[in-house]
């Protein structure tokens, strides 16, 4: 005992505390790996691609969604170890569906030429294509385009590395309440069933854009702000044995239920977009956005009542983009165009929103005192 007591010096205590801080940091980083951020480029004042990727790395953001195969961004991603959801834009869907030669060319130029230096995890063929929106003219081409890209990925020898899917929004859901009764719209079933069948057969997830903000702002009389921000103190929806305290889970689980009803019980979900604007419309405030993002990052580690476990989630978006419309769309960024954080979010720390200088300064002080 005397020997043990003899070595219990302030220096040893500092070393022990530093070790605990480093261990805690590594655990938090691992826990935050379910989170990525969407890299949109619709602004005339955004940083260059190299600066953006360095910002991802410095903030411990390990996943990125890219909406089109921008070669400048892909070059900057080389060697970064950031996992990428690579978009095939709506404007290319019809062309890719028209023949395998086009799919092979697209995969060669935008995937294989950058592999394995860029860790492409998904190809998102199209974004929010739907028979009930202005993209209905593309619906008959979507699944054929997905099939062609899937075949081209396989021919390139990357079939075990890259999954092919598409990103949809909640307009395809006909019934979402209660979540266990979730189902796709009858007038979209022909479209959805083809997608679900493809994903089931290729063991790929469905990519879903989930925005509690729009549900709340469109119906504030029926949907409360706390329920939308993950801050409801009590259960809001009792669905059999499942209890819902936040709208995000209810929306997510309604899609899972809809998938099961469409023969896709084995199909997983990746949340390909979620966010909250800080200005520009009803309910879009700095405080609401900070609260939602902080809680989303924490909640993504936990899962939903129907599907416990980490939820791979991509926050929309990295920057405020001043060329987007309407006004609301300009204010979804985690960062301002000058790379200054709007909310001091760091993805390597549990809880999401914090001042990164706190731990850095504390660790530096410990080291200086040893």
From Swiss-Prot:
Q: Where does the record place the catalytic residues? A: 128, 273
| Catalytic activity entry | Hydrolysis of (1->3)-beta-D-glucosidic linkages in (1->3)-beta-D-glucans
Q: Does the keyword Signal apply?
A: yes
Q: Which SUPFAM superfamilies match?
A: (Trans)glycosidases (SSF51445)
Q: What does this protein do?
A: Implicated in the defense of plants against pathogens.
Gene Ontology CC annotation, any one: vacuole
Q: What class of enzyme is it?
A: hydrolase
GO biological process terms held by the UniProt record: carbohydrate metabolic process; defense response
* Cited Pfam families: Glyco_hydro_17 (PF00332)
Output the Gene3D superfamilies linked to this UniProt entry.
Glycosidases
* Positions bearing carbohydrate: 361
* Residues bearing the modification Pyrrolidone carboxylic acid: 33
How is this protein induced?
By ethylene and salicylic acid.
- EC number(s): the record gives 3.2.1.39
List, alphabetically, the InterPro entries matched.
Glyco_hydro_17 (IPR000490), Glyco_hydro_17_plant (IPR044965), Glycoside_hydrolase_SF (IPR017853)
Please state what the protein is called. Answer: Glucan endo-1,3-beta-glucosidase, basic vacuolar isoform GGIB50
Q: Which GO terms describe its molecular function?
A: glucan endo-1,3-beta-D-glucosidase activity
Q: What is its main location?
A: other
Q: Which UniProt keywords apply?
A: Glycoprotein, Glycosidase, Hydrolase, Plant defense, Pyrrolidone carboxylic acid, Signal, Vacuole
Supply the source organism's classification.
Answer: Eukaryota, Viridiplantae, Streptophyta, Embryophyta, Tracheophyta
Similarity remark? Belongs to the glycosyl hydrolase 17 family.
Q: Which residues form the propeptide?
A: 349-370
Q: State the tissue distribution.
A: Is expressed primarily in epidermal cell of healthy plant, and following induction by ethylene, accumulates in mesophyll cells.
